[in-house]
């Protein structure tokens, strides 16, 4: 049965306030950037020419209205975005070190994204997508946590491949133990997932990327990607594992790097139009290289969503050996 959407995602949609220099008097300046890992991921999918939609909640405020308009401009179907006048849009303040690595401070007590109820979800979006993508930030608080599980079950019932990116953000969890428990709780439903080499010990008994990926495959996940920062990514499937080197970048801001990689990688899985078990490790390596090219371009600009490159730029980067 043909599906209307290639990827539908559920989760946080927020503002990343990223450093943008200082005033003449030395006060810090911050730039308003649309962000949120699921939407960054969808944007990368859309750059590959595929159809996407987002499910989430924003506040009926200047930030929420800006986010809805930004999603529309990115070609993301916004019918699943709830605009609520009783809560504020979630805000993230990002600080960057000399290597472009980030630390976060959040205004989310509660943020609109945590207040999404299942009765507000357009179930047609769940039933009409090839891939349904989630992160773990919708698992931090109720009612969004229950909504996430209900949405995953519904999408799965209608044949969607379930995609998961834990995207651990320590300040948003009450403690590490709860974070680990809840991030693991979704694994029985997951078909494909991406995690970073800093998250392996949170989701598995292993820190080593290869051991962690093999453990996840053993739990029933069908394809695992472990991002390794500037070193690239490790891809693991039933056909084997392979480390795929990254591209040399002039790093400005790593926000959205993993999201853009995963969106680009998943877009290639969808384009190939095969079941997950049919992919050889050689094919997956090719898709990972495409994803690495997208991520390498993403980190050369500030912000997440708006730093994701056009596909023509990606093809140009892919010519670099």
Residue ranges and their predicted role:
Residues 13, 37, 137, 166, ...:
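Active-site metal-binding loops of divalent metal-dependent hydrolases
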Residues 51-134, 315-321:
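Conserved N-terminal subdomain of the carbohydrate kinase-like
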Residues 140-214, 231-232:
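Conserved beta-alpha-beta core of the PfkB/ribokinase-like small-molecule kinase fold
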Residues 1-6, 153, 209-321:
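Conserved phosphate-binding/catalytic region of the ribokinase-like
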Residues 16, 90, 136-140, 295, ...:
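Glycine-rich phosphate/pyrophosphate-binding beta-alpha loops
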Residues 1-77:
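Glycine-rich phosphate/adenosyl-contacting loop at the front of the ribokinase-like
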């Amino acid at each position: 049965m043909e599906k209307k959407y290639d990827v539908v995602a559920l989760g946080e949609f927020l503002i990343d306030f990223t450093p943008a220099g200082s005033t003449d008097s030395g006060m810090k300046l911050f730039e308003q950037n649309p962000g949120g890992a699921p939407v960054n991921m969808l944007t990368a999918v859309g750059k590959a020419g595929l159809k996407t939609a987002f499910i989430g909640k924003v506040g009926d405020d200047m930030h929420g209205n800006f986010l809805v308009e930004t999603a529309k401009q990115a070609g993301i179907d916004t019918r699943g975005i709830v605009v609520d006048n009783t809560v504020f849009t979630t805000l993230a303040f990002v600080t960057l070190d000399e290597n472009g690595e980030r630390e976060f401070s959040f205004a989310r007590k509660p943020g609109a994204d945590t207040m999404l109820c299942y009765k507000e979800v357009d179930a047609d979006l769940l039933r009409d997508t090839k891939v349904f993508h989630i992160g773990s930030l919708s698992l931090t608080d109720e009612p969004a946590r229950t909504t996430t599980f209900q949405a995953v079950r519904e999408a799965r019932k209608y044949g969607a491949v379930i995609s998961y990116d834990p995207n651990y953000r320590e300040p948003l969890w009450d403690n590490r133990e709860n974070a680990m428990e809840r991030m693991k709780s979704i694994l029985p439903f997951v078909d494909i997932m991406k995690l970073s080499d800093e998250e392996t010990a949170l989701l598995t008994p292993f820190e080593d990327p290869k051991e962690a990926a093999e453990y996840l495959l053993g739990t029933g996940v069908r394809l695992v990607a472990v991002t390794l920062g500037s070193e690239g990514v490790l891809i693991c499937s039933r056909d084997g594992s392979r480390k795929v080197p990254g591209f040399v970048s002039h790093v400005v801001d790593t926000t959205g790097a993993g999201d853009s990689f995963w969106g680009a990688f998943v877009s290639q899985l969808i384009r190939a139009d095969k079941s997950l078990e049919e992919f050889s490790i050689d094919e997956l390596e090719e898709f990972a290289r495409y994803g690495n090219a997208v991520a390498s371009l993403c980190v050369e600009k500030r912000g997440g969503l708006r730093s994701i490159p056009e596909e023509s730029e990606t093809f140009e980067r892919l010519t670099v050996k």
